[in-house]
Amino acid sequence: MIVTTTDVIQGAVIDSYLGIVTAEIVYGSNFLRDFLAGIRDVIGGRTGSYERLFEQGQRKAIEELELRAQRLGANAVIGIEIDTGTINVDQSGVLLLITATGTAVRVR
């Protein structure tokens, strides 16, 4: 399976566009726990634990895109975009949301 952020694949011809595929990954977060754990990780304004969480979520979202594209008969996903955000649930925590979107295609 070819996955790319570009709208074309060099050297390949798109035979058919099979549709938009999306994947959503949601992680629960406990503000107090994450805040205390994050104190150890913060170096130069960066929080390693959250960076690893988002990196893992992006990988999982792309894997899910591939699975959904395969179900449509695709052998590639083009134009992939990944967005991240948070959803405030209540005062005790937030949900971390990672969304991936692309176009499932069959190429030769």
From Swiss-Prot:
Lineage of the species this protein comes from: Bacteria, Bacillati, Cyanobacteriota, Cyanophyceae, Nostocales
Organism superkingdom: Bacteria
Signal peptide extent: none
Native organism: Nostoc sp. (strain PCC 7120 / SAG 25.82 / UTEX 2576)
Family: Belongs to the UPF0145 family.
Name of this protein: UPF0145 protein alr2488
Coiled-coil ranges (or none): none
Family annotation (Pfam families): YbjQ_1
